[in-house]
Amino acid sequence: MEEVYLERFPEEGNSVHLLDIPSNEKDWYNPEHVNHWDKIRNVRRVVTGAIEVLRQDKVIGSSLEACPIIYIKDKELFDIIKSVDMSEVCITSSINVEFSLSSIPDSCFTLDDVPDVGVICKTAQGKKCQRCWTLNLPIDKSEGDDLCDRCKQAVI
């Protein structure tokens, strides 16, 4: 850490460990953004709860082996959830988000404090990518082709 700091700022000459921690700008705080991510985290709690049921039943070992289907009854919340990659947020191989005009299916996992959200969790299908470990490769991929399209782009 010290060497990196002195290489980046050679004119400083002081130890990085003696510097004051800079304060955040007051205008950086955005309550709307905080509210937006609070809603995403609440939906994520429902998804991880549904995944945990499969894990306890020994159906899956890792969240990457799950393919949740999220049912959302609130249009505003649905739009917020569709604006982010929920498979990345929930650490799953894939995820489906459905807007439900009627009630949420009875077989869904729900949490009392997160209304209008239900999750059905299934096991992900496919072959495991050797780089990111997601199960999204077609099962009939030829031998030696062990990277998903996203990882192929990253290593090129």
Task: Write out the residue ranges for each language-model feature.
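Flanking scaffold residues of small Cys/His-coordinated metal-binding clusters
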Residues: 124-127, 143
